[in-house]
Every structure is written in C-alpha cells, then in structure tokens.
C-alpha cells in the first residue's frame, strides 16, 4: 500500500498539542488592515492560539495522516 500524502497547506497551519489529543491553530484577522483594530483586539484576543473545533477535527486529521 502506498504512503499517505500530507496536505502541505494544512501542515503549515495546524499542529498537535503536547499530548497529541487536540489540534492547535492560529487565530484569523491579524495579517493586514490592522489600523482600525483596537490594541486590545490585536494583542489580547487575536494573539492567543485556539483549538480546532471538535466538528472540524476529523477533517484536519484526514489531511494530516501522520500527526
């Protein structure tokens, strides 16, 4: 049986937690158009990492077979 391919775009965006049971992602809306956003929004709310929702976790794991 051939090796499973990893989706490279997903590999750059997601990584497992230390235990490997959950998946971490970066929050959106912090790349550009930041002038009108408040400091609180940029630093406190958007800087933290977030967990992938349970409903999406299965799809992410299918894209990353060796995670």
Curated annotation (Swiss-Prot):
This is Large ribosomal subunit protein bL35. InterPro entries: Ribosomal_bL35, Ribosomal_bL35-like, Ribosomal_bL35_CS, Ribosomal_bL35_sf. The gene is rpmI. Belongs to the bacterial ribosomal protein bL35 family. One of its GO terms (molecular function) is structural constituent of ribosome. GO terms for biological process: translation. It comes from the Bacteria. One of its GO terms (cellular component) is cytosolic large ribosomal subunit. The keyword Ribonucleoprotein applies. NCBIfam families: rpmI_bact. The keyword Ribosomal protein applies. Keywords: Ribonucleoprotein, Ribosomal protein. It holds the Pfam family Ribosomal_L35p.
